[in-house]
Amino acid sequence: MEFRAETTLTYGGRNVIQLPNLARELKRRIKNRSAKAGVMGLGYVGLPLALEMAKEGFQVTGIDLSKEKVDTINRGMSYIPDVPSDIVSAFVSNDRLRATQSLGAVGELDTINICVPTPLRKNKDPELSYVVAAVEVIRNHIRPGQLIVLESTTYPGTTRELVMPILEESGLRAGTDFFLAYSPERIDPGNSTYQTRNIPRVVGGVTSRCAEMAALFYRQFIEKVIPV
């Protein structure tokens, strides 16, 4: 992104732009579809989400550690039963969807949705090691103005208590230098009536500006968005 700064801070030895300039620019890019969208985790939640973004004109990068998943998508094929391969193929062919194992790709993105697994432990608590690993990757490549949304199923407070402190180790601050939000995934695999697009989505942010930005983004490809 390119910005005209009015208010700046020092980050990595250089001046960067603070909100609200970052907000205006990201809103503009979201609305005109020039924002580069990314999804971390290409399972039954992440891949359908990436496709909905691509349907609405976003250029989407899917990031997954599985070489098999990445190669399958880039061949224009699906590995999820209720996701047709012809849809994947269409968006790969027109360069709206690509998959990569390169974690550094997050630094090129304007929006990042975290859709990694959170399997239950024996005590029924969610295993958050995949979330932590994903957030640490983002921390290492984060830049001002990015929108980061946690979708993985977890307990209330995870975004503020776990995700935010890790990201802020970068020296940037949520709600000031980047946007941080949570929107719990609600997909029902195999349900032909209610799918990613038409399942209402609750969206919350660590600040009101973060919530506003996340809601704006989701409204581009989700029929009903409920800010909280």
Predicted regions mapped to residue ranges:
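Rossmann-like NAD(P)(H) cofactor-binding subdomain of soluble oxidoreductases
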Residues: 120-186
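Conserved N-terminal Rossmann-fold NAD(P)-binding element of oxidoreductases
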Residues: 38-40
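Internal alpha-helical scaffold of NAD(P)-dependent oxidoreductase catalytic cores
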Residues: 19, 165-181, 187, 192-228
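Redox-cofactor binding/interface segments in oxidoreductases and associated redox assembly factors
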Residues: 112-114, 150, 204
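Short glycine-/small-residue-rich Rossmann-like dinucleotide-binding loops
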Residues: 116-118, 153, 207
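Conserved N-terminal Rossmann-fold NAD(P) cofactor-binding segment
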Residues: 3-4, 8-36, 55, 59-61, ...
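Hydrophobic/small residue at the entry helix of a nucleotide-binding pocket
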Residues: 45
